[in-house]
């Protein structure tokens, strides 16, 4: 039997996410933006709620293409508030449009958002070598630094806990436990 981190065992979608994405380093700006959106919407909710609605989010936010999302107007945001397939939180929807604009500005300044965001881990994956799930953490000094920098850049819904979840999703942090078959892979 293959051992996985216990948090993913609730569904096939969660297992697939764990096995194929979580902790794998991301350097594609559109995928990075996708996880920034999904992690912002996760605030106060379980990750399984977001994973179960992921396809709906992808459709609602035009494939997570920041250039398109940045152009969403008031009417488009109101339409999203009526979309039962996503989390209908006005603050999170508005934050996503705002964040797309900030994302594009930083992307232009740095040549890619990837170059900007990976600076918070020294452009490498941090391996925490967790013995088991009881050692999971909700944030780190790196996520604290990332959060402060993103807030200063005008991003919203980027608290340290959200940033840490993003760092795990984007492979900036690899928190697979030692017994997991993906431990120390990235």
Question: What positions do the PLM features span?
Answer:
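HhH-family (HhH-GPD) DNA N-glycosylase catalytic core used in base-excision repair
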Residues: 1-186
């Amino acid at each position: 039997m293959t051992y996985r981190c216990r948090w993913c065992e609730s569904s096939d979608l969660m297992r697939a996410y764990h096995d194929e994405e979580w902790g794998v380093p991301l350097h594609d700006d559109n995928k990075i933006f996708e996880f920034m959106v999904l992690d912002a919407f996760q605030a106060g909710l379980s990750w399984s709620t977001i994973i179960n609605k992921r396809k709906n989010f992808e459709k609602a936010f035009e494939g997570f293409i920041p250039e398109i999302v940045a152009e969403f107007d008031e009417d488009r945001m109101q339409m999203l508030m009526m979309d039962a397939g996503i989390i209908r939180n006005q603050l999170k929807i508005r934050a996503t449009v705002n964040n797309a604009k900030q994302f594009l500005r930083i992307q232009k300044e740095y040549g890619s958002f990837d170059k900007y965001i990976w600076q918070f881990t020294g452009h490498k994956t941090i391996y925490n070598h967790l013995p088991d799930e009881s050692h999971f953490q909700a944030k780190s000094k790196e996520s604290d630094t990332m959060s402060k920098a993103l807030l200063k850049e005008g991003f919203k819904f980027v608290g340290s806990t959200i940033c840490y979840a993003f760092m795990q999703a984007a492979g900036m942090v690899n928190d697979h436990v030692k017994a997991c078959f993906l431990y120390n892979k990235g």
